[in-house]
């Protein structure tokens, strides 16, 4: 069975405007799966779509939705009702701002939980039944090393990523014997535009174009993801992340 037969004909990628999300979408298209590109900024999504179409034969569709807003999952479901979605990858999720929990309004934490917990859960509940019925499909939920243990200045973020990991593990337990691959992909520091901006604001790097110390390359992360789609329920990306987990065990 080809990749496209198992996971196609369409994939939905949430958070695919740049970084690991855009790279994952490109990887899907290279494997002949059509991709719905989803994020807040339509203009950027259109650029990603154009790049994909110029390099692969897959079709694309762009969908601009703010995942922090209530009703986001319903809007996504309505906008993709004419498509057969065989693969869902959820890599949206804001980086922490490294402020104490009490220094931010509660609305900031609520938006984080909406984006990182509620929407992926709702999308899985919507799209997974058709995958189960066909006996094939895939779901990848991006997690973070911040979800492995609580830490200051990442209270809502780390907690939401802990949810993502446990949710993926539990969903794998229910779906893997039904032909649906579920993977919680746990990332460490990754050289994305969002991380570079964050580290630049914190004074950790001198320019937003600098590579943060110890950050994994996006292409390496995506290569590991595709190589381990069937190795759920979780996969720790990068040797440094796996070593850190071993030390915590």
Model-predicted segments: where are they?
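Conserved glycine-rich cofactor-binding loop
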Residues: 10, 15-19
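Rossmann-fold scaffold of SDR-type NAD(P)-dependent oxidoreductases
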Residues: 14, 85-93, 116, 141
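Conserved glycine-rich Rossmann-like NAD(P)H-binding loop of the short-chain dehydrogenase/reductase
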Residues: 31-47
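Active-site helix of classical SDR
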Residues: 124, 160
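Residue(s) in the substrate-gating loop at a strand-loop-helix junction
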Residues: 144
């Amino acid at each position: 069975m080809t990749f496209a037969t198992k996971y196609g004909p369409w994939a939905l990628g949430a958070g695919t405007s740049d970084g690991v999300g855009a790279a994952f979408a490109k990887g899907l298209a290279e494997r002949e799966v059509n991709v719905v590109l989803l994020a807040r900024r339509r203009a950027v999504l259109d650029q990603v779509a154009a790049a994909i179409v110029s390099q692969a034969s897959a079709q694309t569709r762009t969908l601009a939705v703010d995942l922090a807003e209530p009703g986001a999952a319903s809007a996504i479901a309505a906008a993709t009702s004419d498509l057969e979605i065989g693969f869902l990858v959820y890599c949206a999720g804001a980086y922490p701002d490294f402020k104490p929990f009490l220094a931010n309004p509660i609305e900031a934490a609520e938006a984080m939980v909406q984006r990182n917990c509620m929407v992926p859960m709702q999308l899985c509940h919507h799209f997974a039944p058709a995958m189960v019925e066909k006996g094939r499909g895939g779901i990848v939920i991006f997690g973070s090393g911040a979800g492995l243990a609580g830490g200051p200045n990442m209270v809502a973020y780390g907690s939401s990523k802990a949810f993502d990991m446990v949710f993926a593990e539990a969903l794998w337990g229910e779906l893997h014997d039904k032909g649906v691959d579920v993977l919680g992909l746990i990332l460490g520091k990754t050289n994305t535009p969002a991380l570079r901006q964050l580290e630049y604001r914190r004074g950790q790097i001198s320019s937003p174009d600098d590579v943060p110390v110890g950050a994994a390359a996006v292409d390496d992360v995506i290569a590991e993801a595709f190589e381990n789609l069937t190795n759920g329920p979780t996969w720790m990306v990068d040797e440094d992340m796996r070593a850190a987990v071993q030390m915590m065990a």
